[in-house]
Structures are given as C-alpha cells and as structure tokens.
Amino acid sequence: MTYQKIILAGGNGYLGSLLAKHFSNEAEQVIILARKPKAQIGNIKTIVWDGKTVGTWVSEMENADLLINLCGKNVNCRYTPKNQEEIINSRVLPTRLLGNVIKDLMAPPKLWINMSSATIYRHAEDHAQDEYTGEIGYGFSIDVCKAWERSFFENELPQTRMVTLRMGIALGRTDGAFPRLLNLVKLGLGGRQGDGKQYVNWVHEQDAVLTIEWLLNHKEINGIINCTAPDAVTNEVLMRTIRKAYGIPFGIPTPAWLLAIGAKIIGTETELILKSRWVKPAVLLDNGFEFQYSKIEEAVHDILSLRI
C-alpha cells in the first residue's frame, strides 16, 4: 500500500464516498469520522464523532498521511437565520476542533486539506478569478467561506502541511448537481437558467479525487488551491451540452423570476444557480497537474456513458 492512513472527517457525503473508495485501494486504512455508526467495509472504518468534542477518535489522528475535512451542512436550503447559523457552525466548529487536536499530537497528519468553496470569489462575467489576483465577493455564501478559511489558517501547525481547497461544482452520475440537471433535461426543462450568461465552475468528480492525491504527493504545495476545471462554461453552454449528449433537441429556458418562485417552493436560494462563478485553477496548472477532463463536452460524455 502507498499510504498508511487516510482520515475523512465528515466523509459520508458525495465527495467523501468517492475519496473513501479511491483511497481504500491506496492505503492500509481509511478512517471516516461521522455522526452515525456504520459497519466496517474492507479497510474503510467509521468512527463516531460529533465534530464538537474530543473523544476516542483523537488517537486515530496519529501517523495519518492525510486528513481531509469535508464537514458542512448542505447549503441547498433557504438562508433563514437558523440555517445560516448551522451552515457556519457546521464548518467552523469541526475545523477549530481538528486544529486544537492536531496541536497536541506526537505524530500529527502530514497533510491537512480543508474544504472551502470557489464561490468565495465575486460574481464574475468579465474574467476568471484565480488564487493570485482573484477578488473576494460579498454576501452570505462568501461570509461562510471566509469564516471557514479563517478558522483553518488560524492554526500554526509546523509538522502539518495545510491546504484549503476551493472546490468547484463536482460533476458525476450518482450524486451532486449533475443528476438534477439531467432530470431537467429529461423533462424538457433543460434550457438556460436566468439569462444563461453566468459561469459555472465545474470539475469532473475523478479530477477532484485526483487533485487531492496529487496534492498529497506534491509536498511543496500549500495554501489556497482552486479545484475547478480550466475551461469554465456559461450555464447556457452547460445545459446545451447535456441536452446534446443525451439526445434531447430542445429545452425550455427558466427565467430568473420563475427560478425565484421555484426556489421558495423547494426551499433553496437562486444564488446557487444565478451567481456567475468564473474560476481558474492557476496553481494546479502552473505546477503541472493534468486534468483528465478539461472540457465540459468530455466530462459530460464520460458521465453519461456510466449508465446505471
């Protein structure tokens, strides 16, 4: 095995499941820290924690090659005061807890990757935002990211390399955004959303996983990393690409006012669809990371080839 131990805090979600499966073939142990117990599957073991207090899970942190913190309440909800508090606390509290625990370990994780979101950048239709010159936006989603990253970088951990991964929208067949977009296409509703000019910072799920392993093996890299495909596309292009690949010739567009009504009905926010996220993974590209799926057409065709 290449690695001794991989730890996934909050690793029962979409991306965590992908990482657990991938690293189960690369590591002796994969440890998932989760709120609910789960039977061990092969070398993947779940240990219960609440993300707020220390417990028996702390000993598992010793000698880990990699700790990935994936904790966070789903933002696909209405931004009520209660939900806003839960969204922030579910990210900040586990991050601070992990930092405090790592400080006292004899053999702390070699690399700690903390998730963040590429939505931290401003609404951008004029040019791409990268790690060097990107402009931070404003609003609740950005405040969440700023608090999340601040709670991460407030730690001084000389024995642990630290990376915050500003994730784009991971696209895959089984979960995440793609199945929902595909359902709209199947219903004939796969036209542009709003004016369709807003950019979507996507990344194929395989590239998201490979980025994390690449970071594990490139010890000179730390700090802020954008995890998005290099070829961002507009919402209109994304929807047209899915329609064409699936063989649906048309798609009824959804104007912004109708999206606002629909968002209230299903309990979400239009910002998740209408904000233009044009983000470039400059650090990955500058340091030689090679995307398997850099073009949206390649990614969509691959995902749709995985018929279930």
Show where each model-derived region lies.
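Conserved Rossmann-fold NAD(P)-dependent oxidoreductase catalytic core, especially the SDR/UDP-sugar
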Residues: 96-138
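Alpha-helical substrate-binding/gating segment
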Residues: 182-190, 198-232
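N-terminal Rossmann NAD(P)H-binding glycine-rich loop of SDR-like oxidoreductase domains
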Residues: 6-26
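Mid/C-terminal beta-alpha module of Rossmann-like enzyme folds, strongest
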Residues: 215-266, 301-304, 308
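NAD(P)H-binding glycine-rich loop region in Rossmannoid oxidoreductase-like domains
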Residues: 45-94
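C-terminal amphipathic/interface module of NAD(P)-dependent oxidoreductases
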Residues: 1, 250, 271-308
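Glycine-rich "substrate-gating" loop/helix at the edge of Rossmann-like oxidoreductase active sites
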Residues: 136-139, 168-175, 195-205
